[in-house]
Amino acid sequence: MIPGEIITAAGEIELNAGLETVTIEVANSGDRPVQVGSHYHFAEANPGLLFDRDAARGKRLDIPAGTAVRFEPGQTRQVTLIPLSGKREVFGFRQQVMGKL
């Protein structure tokens, strides 16, 4: 073994396997790019993003941890969301929940 080496199991790892998903269309109505991180409560994302916020309540992007999706000005794209897990409590962000979902 080499110091710092990572030895992984054979095969592929499926992220977020078995979680319920919802796909929504998101449009950036602003004049600047907006980036949303993997674990951000999507319903509280930048108000310049236009989408069904009720459908996004309690959900985050279905992307690898530590990554983000960028919405360029005027861009419309579809994203897939998965439920937030754990205690399902949301604090901070834009302070629209501040407690249990």
Curated annotation (Swiss-Prot):
Its main location: cytoplasm. Disulfide bonds: none annotated. One of its GO terms (cellular component) is urease complex. It catalyses: urea + 2 H2O + H(+) = hydrogencarbonate + 2 NH4(+). The keyword Cell wall biogenesis/degradation does not apply. Pathway: Nitrogen metabolism; urea degradation; CO(2) and NH(3) from urea (urease route): step 1/1. The keyword Hydrolase applies. GO terms for biological process: urea catabolic process. Its EC number is 3.5.1.5. Heterotrimer of UreA (gamma), UreB (beta) and UreC (alpha) subunits. Three heterotrimers associate to form the active enzyme. HAMAP family: Urease_beta. PANTHER family: UREASE. This is Urease subunit beta. The gene is ureB.
